[in-house]
């Protein structure tokens, strides 16, 4: 890990110089290195103090939320877990360690979606941001207003049982004999195939069909939310089923699901696993034409950029807006904070909870894939 023409002693002095703010620490660390009582990781030895543009740790604050197979979690919680399965820059689920990198100066990067949705990410000055339409990455310190950050979603196919689960959760009723009934009006006939696919018995009414679920037709607790650990396919199917029961696609345009606090919280935590990003919710009036609601109810809105035809089991998909990226609005100093970052082995990038693609930290410069470049580095 010595640089070209560098002696072992010179290498130890260079690495120890990372603690140059304290001569006592510098001397103690240099002595430790010289006597080989401790050796840092090879990438650190080759990069720290090297006369080339490198960035030892490019990290994010602990409150930054990322998408994992266990749902959305903060970087701090991911670090406590140690290894998580997250979504890389190719849209693949991969395992990655999440590491703490000490206390560093951080900055608030304010990101906006065409001025409608704004959020803040805390990052170090050297954090490498993936930029839309470019293979190059930009440091936090070099971000400008208007810099475009890619927006992504992984949209799996629906688990058929999950669609039925979501449909009954949203519009069905539990019976005293541990079964379920669901009345589907004729104007919602697009719902029929979801239930007919499982040969659910029904009777005709003057308004449509009344479906009855009992015995072998009950595969789960249909009036409960999917459990922790549900697959992306199950999450996708459930959300699409709830939309079919209690959702609407408006000309504003908006993709909306109506639900209670627990559904809202579940969608915020697990929706991103299937590419559904909640952007907000408005509380509905407690008083309705049918009386007073027994619990708080919300219109829950989703980011339209990742809504697909498969998500729209009813409504006119042509209302959906075209894809657009996140845009940097401002960068301001935040202060000293403990920072964290995953180490993604495939793309050195991963998805944040809102679908924004972020780079991860690295400790050596990017070099060309050739033996000459490797030897020169």
Identify the residue ranges that each predicted region occupies:
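Long, continuous compositionally biased terminal/linker segments
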Residues: 217-224, 288-323, 331
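Extended catalytic cores of very large enzyme megasubunits
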Residues: 1-63, 143-147, 155, 159, ...
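Long, charge-dense accessory insertions within large macromolecular proteins
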Residues: 60-94, 319-324
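Fold-independent oxyanion-binding glycine-rich loops
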Residues: 69-70, 87-90, 151-154, 171, ...
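Intein-associated homing endonuclease modules of the LAGLIDADG/DOD-type, together
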Residues: 43, 61, 81, 98-288, ...
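Short, structural beta-strand-to-alpha-helix junction motif
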Residues: 7, 69-78, 137-141, 231
